[in-house]
Amino acid sequence: SVGFKAGVKDYKLTYYTPDNQTKDTDILAAFRVTPQPGVPPEEAGAAVAAESSTGTWTTVWTDGLTSLDRYKGRCYHIEPVAGEENQFIAYVAYPLDLFEEGSVTNMFTSIVGNVFGFKALRALRLEDLRIPNAYVKTFQGPPHGIQVERDKLNKYGRPLLGCTIKPKLGLSAKNYGRAVYECLRGGLDFTKDDENVNSQPFMRWRDRFLFCAEALYKAQAETGEIKGHYLNATAGTCEEMIKRAVFARELGVPIVMHDYLTGGFTANTSLAHYCRDNGLLLHIHRAMHAVIDRQKNHGMHFRVLAKALRLSGGDHIHSGTVVGKLEGEREITLGFVDLLRDDFVEKDRSRGIYFTQDWVSLPGVLPVASGGIHVWHMPALTEIFGDDSVLQFGGGTLGHPWGNAPGAVANRVALEACVQARNEGRDLASEGNQIIREASKWSPELAAACEVWKE
């Protein structure tokens, strides 16, 4: 017959290839698929592969001008999810040529751009991605990474301590700077702009930057330690964001901050490049992540957003606590914490890791634990997150009955006590409360904190 065969056709004929060997250069995705009643899983999986790569709903004659076999995504394996009715994990392989080099934005537009509103699916969740070495190498990644950050700050062998300045909205720049000074003077390494602090009428960004820089240098001079404050450079336009980062660099501060999901990956990658070129560390907040990752059967798991951030660039990222006010399951959280820090992570389904990921020496990111944590959580946090982490106590510092500086002292004493106990070989899991109690005997600030927040 002449021409091509017009009409609607089953996706699974073209896009379901169960015997297909994946290539080392493919991007692999694991989707949790919930098909509509009556839709077979093979068709649902194939539909996902098609819609997120070369497919469209009907045969088009321009298909003849390209090599589908070379460019199509393939659903190469489907398995039922244990304990769930009518849920499947569909594995899809995408040829590398479908993606623009060094663009997280394009990667997401392709893989999750269109397919989530698909009629044949009740729900769809992207659980994990395997980024091939060849694609990882097209990204700059974190501006500096864990080792360089430790060298810049001259802080080794312990987690770093931070504090988000509260009340998050309403303080004047000068009072804000004062709170920053008190926390840093008391013994914290970092203080942080809240994610919603950008440049509002009650406190414009330039004033805040100035007073925070002053606070930082004063605390630095008095303690002999290097201090930082995450100056939030997030803005309404990329140009304005870079302008703020430039001002931070001119002040000579060590670190700026960005909300990478609300700001967007394009803006984030631009900022990360600026930060590497100009010696700024970059702290990343994940505001809006729960909109995307909270539902168990639809959206995207946070580990995917975390991987994307490591490609796009950031030196710190918030990653849940396992113990405070925001939810997080221990094994799963540790799974993506390792994905952020380590150079090579083995596939381990019990920790939610669907693929072995090699980062080929891309710098690592420090996970930040924050949200409803206080001194009694310190042993658990030290044990769970280890040395390469930032522990952030907002209310857990500023809520101290004697004020901000004593709150900072309490946290620093608790941390040093836990690190020392661990180095002496004690078991933080079972002796944690005991360790904190012992330390509070010679630190009145810590004793007061222990009173306010009961174990």
Curated annotation (Swiss-Prot):
Pfam families recorded: RuBisCO_large, RuBisCO_large_N
Site annotation Transition state stabilizer: residues: 325
Residue positions, PTM N6,N6,N6-trimethyllysine: 5
Matching PROSITE patterns: RUBISCO_LARGE
Domain of life: Eukaryota
Residues annotated with N6-carboxylysine modification: 192
Cofactor(s) listed in the protein's UniProt record: Mg(2+)
Enzyme class: lyase
Entry binding sites for Mg(2+): 192, 194-195
GO molecular function, one term: monooxygenase activity
Annotated binding of substrate, by residue: 114, 164, 168, 286, 318, 370
Listed GO biological process terms: photorespiration; reductive pentose-phosphate cycle
UniProt-annotated location(s): Plastid, Chloroplast
The record's free-text note on cofactor binding: Binds 1 Mg(2+) ion per subunit.
UniProt-annotated catalytic positions: 166, 285
Subunit note: Heterohexadecamer of 8 large chains and 8 small chains; disulfide-linked. The disulfide link is formed within the large subunit homodimers.
Purpose of the protein: RuBisCO catalyzes two reactions: the carboxylation of D-ribulose 1,5-bisphosphate, the primary event in carbon dioxide fixation, as well as the oxidative fragmentation of the pentose substrate in the photorespiration process. Both reactions occur simultaneously and in competition at the same active site.
PANTHER family: RIBULOSE BISPHOSPHATE CARBOXYLASE, RIBULOSE BISPHOSPHATE CARBOXYLASE LARGE CHAIN
Homology family: Belongs to the RuBisCO large chain family. Type I subfamily.
Protein name from the UniProt record: Ribulose bisphosphate carboxylase large chain
Gene name tied to this protein: rbcL
